[in-house]
């Protein structure tokens, strides 16, 4: 069994393993979306304040300098405090306690925001786990867009904005700022989406 977390990769795997009848290709959401913030040890915070900006600055970024400027101008115009963050923690050879603290601290940071603006896959997922409304932008690969299309198309606290829509980003920011936070004991996707994975694991 080989499981992909979005349909483009699943199609590539089906093509790659087409000659091997003993290889089953499955499709399930990113495994992190099977959890929720409470299960991951995060507690609720005071009333959410400010906007969290979690945008790539590496080779996987798809935004131009002009688009970054548009985004920052629109965020500043809200009058809210803007905090910049990333989902890459750095470091290596971390023990379990250190990893747990990094994750719970990051979830708490996302929960404490009124809105998250991100082009990172796990920035989007952390937003959904924390119940915080999220404005999602594309990056240079298909993963974040296809994850949204496959599993999160109708999520009430998520808006995916294409690059040619960034000129209108202020409208989407204002709309999402009025969306209330979700509960922290809810998973972003229906747990039944993982049934095929569960069956495969039981059969091992």
Predicted features, each with a name:
Residues 1-204:
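Active-site anion-handling motifs in enzyme catalytic cores
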